[in-house]
């Protein structure tokens, strides 16, 4: 063991610092750190230390003798008392217990450098290995000092540590192969240049009190992560906003005429003053054209600066037709998108309709749902329609009703025409009677022979009902004869043959006529 080895943060030739100090601060912190570690409830292996020491007594005694020799050589220069020596030997047992049980679990801490890492406080270690879990799904940023990502498993962290060793700002290799220099940076400028040099041959692989401290810090590193959402203020939510532009003061005057209810949708600006980044925040541009001749120039200039955009054109009185034609030309070339057709600024009715349409869009976009909800009107009590009768729903009801009505009308007409004919025939028969019959009728009318009238008049009600029944019977017979005459006149065999055509006629006309006659009989 050579006594020329460098110590933590000490300049060449100055060996007044402690070699086994657990903190980069004062020399008296070693006892407190070791006692806190020995009696800490976070150390699960303190209770089994005696069992492990019994099995590893041989190896422990040999290492203890070497450490005692090293301490005796540097005891005078470093002013190490016996309490620190006992504390170090007891911590040495804790180190062996850790290495015997959970060495593989924290192997990634020593994968880059086989040397031990000394004099790192808890804040410095978290600065090197700390990380933040974020709910953002964007691409992960490169961690400072190539810290392992907390989203990786233990095996993936080990592979990442081997592939990308820590940079020189955290742990760097300096000097020859026998000596390794570890640099740690903290917020204090006084302690920013702390370095430590230890020989691999002096400390050995996987031994030393400082390795136990690193393992304990690994526990705190594993439990120090917290979840914080990653908020981005560069890209805020795009809302419904319209920028009013004009080449004069028309935009300000138009904005001042609006009510406070509608001013929330608009901002005022001048042509070509808004940058391209600011223009992306607006839904559309409302341009007030003072002259129809400048429409093409203004739109070309804005298209070259902002690209395709949404336009709400406002024109002056008498220029609506020319502005409409020029705006449609740009819309057909896919340079602009029209939110509305040109509106005359002096027409209050058109301006009011435009503002009402824009406000409905503003409310719809701001609330993220459709505002036009169909209203359900309750039917009035008196507005209920009466259900149609069951017979009216049948298609065959109306044809039959019409046929019966026409038939009854024909029957009544035929009856009255027949009654007029019978009365005319009876009057002619009376004229042709004999003279004695005429005299008898005249006497009966004058009242000279009432017996004749009594015989001709009905004697009782039964005789009257008989005459009525006879009249109904005669009427039915006459209607039957009328129907037969009508059907025979319109549905004759010759008529059927003529309607079919000349091609229906055959050389054997008798058989054809007999078949058609049989068909007529079936129908009748």
Swiss-Prot record:
Gene Ontology cellular component annotations, sorted alphabetically: mitochondrial outer membrane; phagophore assembly site membrane; vacuolar membrane
Membrane topology recorded in Swiss-Prot or TrEMBL: Single-pass membrane protein
Regions of compositional bias (Low complexity) in chain numbering: 24-36
Organism: Kluyveromyces lactis (strain ATCC 8585 / CBS 2359 / DSM 70799 / NBRC 1267 / NRRL Y-1140 / WM37) (Yeast)
TM segment ranges: 396-416
Keyword set, alphabetical order: Autophagy, Membrane, Mitochondrion, Mitochondrion outer membrane, Transmembrane, Transmembrane helix, Vacuole
Gene name tied to this protein: ATG32
Compartments where located: Mitochondrion outer membrane; Vacuole membrane; Preautophagosomal structure membrane
Protein name (Swiss-Prot/TrEMBL): Autophagy-related protein 32
Annotated segments matching region Disordered: 1-37, 165-196
Family, as annotated: Belongs to the ATG32 family.
Ranges annotated as biased composition (Polar residues): 165-183
Function: Mitophagy-specific receptor that recruits the autophagic machinery to mitochondria and regulates selective degradation of mitochondria. Mitophagy contributes to regulate mitochondrial quantity and quality by eliminating the mitochondria to a basal level to fulfill cellular energy requirements and preventing excess ROS production. Recruits ATG11 to the surface of mitochondria. Also promotes autophagy-dependent peroxisome degradation.
Main subcellular localisation: mitochondrion
A single GO BP: autophagy
């Amino acid at each position: 063991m050579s006594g020329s080895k460098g110590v933590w943060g000490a300049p060449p030739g100055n060996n007044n610092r402690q070699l086994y100090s657990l903190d980069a601060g004062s020399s008296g912190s070693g006892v407190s750190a070791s006692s806190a570690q020995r009696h800490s409830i976070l150390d699960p292996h303190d209770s089994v230390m005696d069992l492990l020491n019994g099995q590893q007594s041989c190896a422990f005694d040999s290492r203890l003798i070497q450490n005692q020799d090293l301490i005796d050589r540097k005891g005078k220069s470093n002013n190490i008392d016996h309490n620190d020596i006992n504390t170090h030997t007891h911590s040495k047992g804790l180190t062996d217990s850790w290495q015997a049980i959970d060495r593989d679990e924290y192997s990634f801490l020593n994968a880059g450098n086989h040397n031990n890492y000394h004099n790192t406080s808890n804040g410095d270690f978290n600065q090197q290995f700390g990380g933040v879990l974020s709910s953002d799904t964007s691409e992960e940023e490169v961690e400072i000092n190539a810290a392992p990502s907390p989203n990786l498993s233990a095996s993936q962290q080990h592979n990442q540590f081997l592939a990308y060793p820590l940079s020189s700002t955290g742990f760097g290799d300096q000097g020859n192969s026998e000596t390794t220099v570890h640099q740690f940076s903290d917020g204090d400028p006084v302690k920013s240049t702390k370095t430590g040099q230890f020989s691999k041959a002096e400390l050995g692989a996987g031994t030393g009190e400082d390795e136990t401290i690193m393992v304990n810090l690994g526990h705190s590193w594993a439990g120090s992560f917290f979840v914080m959402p990653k908020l981005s203020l560069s890209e805020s939510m795009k809302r419904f906003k319209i920028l009013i532009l004009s080449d004069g003061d028309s935009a300000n005057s138009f904005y001042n005429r609006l009510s406070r209810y509608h001013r929330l949708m608009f901002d005022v600006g001048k042509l070509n003053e808004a940058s391209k980044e600011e223009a992306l925040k607006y839904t559309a541009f409302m341009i007030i054209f003072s002259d129809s001749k400048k429409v093409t120039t203004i739109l070309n200039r804005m298209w070259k600066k902002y690209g395709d955009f949404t336009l709400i054109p406002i024109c002056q009185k008498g220029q609506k037709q020319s502005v409409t034609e020029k705006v449609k030309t740009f819309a057909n070339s896919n340079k602009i998108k029209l939110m509305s057709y040109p509106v005359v600024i002096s027409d209050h009715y058109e301006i009011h309709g435009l503002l009402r349409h824009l406000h409905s869009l503003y409310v719809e976009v701001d609330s993220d749902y459709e505002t036009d909800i169909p209203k359900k009107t309750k039917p009035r009590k008196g507005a209920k329609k009466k259900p149609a009768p069951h017979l009216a729903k049948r298609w065959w009801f109306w044809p039959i009703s019409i046929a019966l009505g026409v038939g009854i009308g024909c029957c009544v007409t035929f009856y009255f025409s027949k009654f007029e004919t019978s009365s005319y025939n009876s009057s002619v028969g009376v004229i042709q009677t004999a003279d004695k019959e005429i005299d008898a009728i005249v006497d009966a009318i004058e009242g000279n022979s009432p017996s004749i009238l009594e015989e001709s008049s009905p004697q009782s009600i039964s005789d009257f009902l008989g005459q009525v029944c006879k009249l109904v019977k005669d009427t039915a017979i006459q209607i039957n004869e009328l129907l037969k005459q009508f059907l025979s006149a319109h549905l004759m065999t010759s008529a059927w043959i003529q309607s079919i055509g000349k091609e229906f006629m055959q050389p054997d006309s008798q058989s054809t006529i007999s078949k058609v006659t049989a068909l007529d009989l079936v129908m009748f």
